[in-house]
């Protein structure tokens, strides 16, 4: 079962270029240095169209990448850059004629219900329309159609969040530590996508060197770093990385095996 993964956004909560910054990366003419807020789209062949997070930039990301359908949404956590595009999902409700399933851990589901109370409160007046979201709390592996989804526990600072594995592909953003139980879930990967914010230490994100250490332990065929800030220029940083490791960029497409033969 093959799928196409598209990086809708590979930047931080600020995005790149960052407002008011005149550094070399923020002024770069390399399109790979223009990073919107973090999200990916997974389009499974003859299967579901899956969003991972609804970023602040979702509307433009969907238009740029010509996404015509969303069958499910996976949330990693509830920080603004990962959820604040949720209202834009309502256009897919209109086109598809029904609610869209969404999946999140217990804390994130609670945060979504509070932050978007107008969506989840049935007494809210419709006005110009509200998203229809069928929100499920994740308690373990689950299926979206024929696609097996394996949640991967992560830490974003002290906060537990989720990454996801589909087949031989894993997406681990916004993390600075993997608990012991996460490592066995990453065995046999072909492609690993991993948070790598910058070179300087950060309390809630992997640095480039820390992310390289994780990749060395997991040993996928290929690793892509995401959630990069303006301290990492694409061309310069990419040239310094070892074989089998690259920076992702907005619009990058990967072909993955989304089957469940790894379980």
Regions found by a protein language model. Name each.
Residues 33, 55, 175, 201-208:
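A conditional alpha-helix N-cap/helix-loop micro-motif detector
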Residues 1-172, 181, 238-262:
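Binuclear metal-dependent hydrolase catalytic cores
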Residues 11, 55, 176, 197, ...:
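Anionic group-transfer/hydrolysis microenvironments
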Residues 139, 179-263:
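Binuclear metal-ion centers of metallo-dependent hydrolases, dominated by the metallo-beta-lactamase
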Residues 151-152, 172-174, 194, 225-226:
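Thr-Gly-centered strand-to-loop micro-motif
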């Amino acid at each position: 079962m093959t799928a196409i993964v598209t990086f809708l956004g590979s930047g931080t909560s600020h995005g790149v270029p960052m407002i008011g910054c005149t550094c070399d990366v923020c002024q770069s003419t390399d399109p790979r240095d223009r990073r919107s807020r973090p999200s990916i789209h997974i389009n499974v062949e003859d299967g579901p169209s899956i969003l991972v997070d609804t970023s602040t930039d979702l509307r433009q990301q969907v238009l740029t990448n010509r996404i015509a359908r969303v069958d499910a949404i996976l949330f990693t956590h509830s920080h603004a850059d990962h959820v604040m595009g949720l209202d834009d999902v309502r256009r897919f409700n209109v086109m598809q004629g029904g609610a869209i399933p969404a999946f999140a851990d217990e804390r994130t589901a609670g945060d979504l219900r509070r932050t978007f109370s107008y969506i989840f409160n049935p007494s809210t007046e419709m006005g110009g329309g509200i998203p229809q979201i069928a929100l499920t709390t994740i308690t373990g592996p689950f299926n979206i159609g024929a696609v097996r989804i394996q949640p991967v526990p992560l830490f974003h600072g002290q906060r537990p969040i989720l990454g996801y594995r589909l087949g031989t592909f894993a997406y681990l953003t916004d993390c600075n530590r993997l608990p012991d139980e996460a490592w066995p879930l990453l065995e046999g990967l072909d492609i690993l996508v991993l948070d790598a914010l910058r070179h300087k230490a950060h309390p809630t994100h992997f640095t480039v060197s820390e992310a390289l250490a994780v990749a060395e332990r997991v040993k996928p065929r290929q690793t892509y770093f995401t959630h990069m800030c303006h301290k990492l220029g694409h061309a310069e940083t990419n040239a310094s990385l070892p074989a089998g490791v690259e920076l992702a960029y907005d619009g990058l497409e990967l072909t993955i095996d989304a089957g469940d033969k790894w379980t």
